Regions:
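Carbohydrate-active catalytic/glycan-binding domains of CAZyme proteins
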Residues: 19-335
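Bacterial Sec-dependent N-terminal signal peptides
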Residues: 1-22
Length: 335
């Protein structure tokens, strides 16, 4: 018995040393909806996020949700909030073992006029790389607690994991900008895609060559229903846009739209999710879609399973998205 205990203690000690030295440690597969941990064993805190693939490394950026959740009084919807915690970054070579890189863009304390003050909203950060300027550019949704500010914020860095320097925020072409994503096309042109006009339209706006400001080229995607949580990808020269309905932190069905050009006509396509749970996007909300390297028909669909009364405890749902007869199909898998 004593021998086994000694062996166990030695093993536990080795694991601990490996973690402290930042070496590879065995991490269980990422079970959807369970707490996911980084290489140090801490819960991954990167919500409403996106991935950047750069020089063989994946960087995961997301909202830091930390602290007590409270309900903003006198709102028309369940406006649950935590202090705006800035943007975190994790890195991985295998999309499975995630190393915490630190806070890529910190929030600001005690300056209520600043976009990044902890009293505000910093959501859905995404990062792309500009080959010409050699800068990493982050766009995000910045807002007031009641969502009346509705602006797109931009930050820049020389290194993928940051730190990022905040440059300010805009209403692109005078248009409201809430839930946002960022897309870089094969021709190096980049676009922001954001919920606008009180979520009645999604808009796509071409960015300047340095990716730091919106141009006047933009399009309004209208549909019968309000949309949020945009995620864009390209397949066989067509563009696909997955969005959610607008029910705050509560899940709802996803839909997709398809277009021949990002600024072109978008056609509504229906619900990409199928099987039990499809009607709530498997209790989650879209945030990003990443092409899987070496698997031309397969994408990674990233979504958030929000815990509205304890936002810090929100979870991640990553599912395979398969293109079948020109349509995206998302099915549940356990991990
Ligand atoms: C969601 C939106 C989230 C967050 C939330 C607040 O629908 O997609 O990013 O803003 O509303 O209620």
């Amino acid at each position: 018995m004593k021998k086994y205990l000694m062996a166990f203690l030695l093993f536990a000690n080795l694991c601990c040393d490996a973690q402290q030295a930042g070496k590879h440690v065995e991490i269980p597969p990422m079970p959807n909806g369970k707490v996911w941990k980084d290489t140090k064993g801490n819960p991954i805190n990167a919500h409403g996020g996106g991935l950047l693939a750069h020089n063989g490394i994946y960087y995961w950026f997301g909202e830091i949700k930390k602290g007590k959740t409270w309900l903003v009084p006198d709102q028309q919807w369940e406006d649950y909030r935590v202090p705006a915690g800035g943007v975190s970054c994790y890195s991985s070579e295998d999309m499975h073992t995630w190393k915490y890189e630190g806070i890529a863009l910190p929030s600001v304390t005690g300056n209520a006029k600043h976009d990044l003050d902890t009293s505000k909203v910093i959501e859905r950060p995404k990062v792309i790389y500009n080959k010409r300027t050699k800068k990493f550019v982050m766009w995000m949704h910045v807002d007031a607690n009641d969502y009346s500010y509705s602006q797109a914020g931009v930050a820049v860095s020389d290194k993928p994991a940051g730190p990022y320097t905040y440059l300010g925020s805009v209403k692109p072409n005078g248009q409201m900008s809430r839930d946002i994503t960022l897309y870089k096309d094969d021709d190096e042109k980049a676009y922001i895609i954001y919920a606008s006009e009180s979520n009645k339209t999604m808009q796509v706006c071409l960015l300047s060559d340095d990716y730091l400001s919106p141009t006047t080229s933009y399009t309004r995607i209208t549909s019968a229903i309000n949309r949020e949580a945009p995620a864009v990808f390209k397949y066989n020269k067509k563009y696909y846009l997955i969005t959610s309905d607008c029910t705050g932190w509560s899940p709802n069905p996803a839909t997709f739209a398809v277009a021949d050009s990002l600024l072109g006509e978008w056609t509504q396509g229906g619900d990409p999710c199928t099987g039990t749970g499809a009607e709530t996007t498997f209790q989650s909300q879209s945030t990003y879609v990443l092409p899987m390297p070496g698997q031309p028909n397969t994408f990674l669909f990233m979504a958030d399973r929000w815990n509205k009364t304890n936002l810090e405890d929100s979870r991640y749902i990553w599912l395979p998205l398969q293109m079948v007869n020109g349509k995206p199909v998302i099915k549940w898998v356990d991990k």
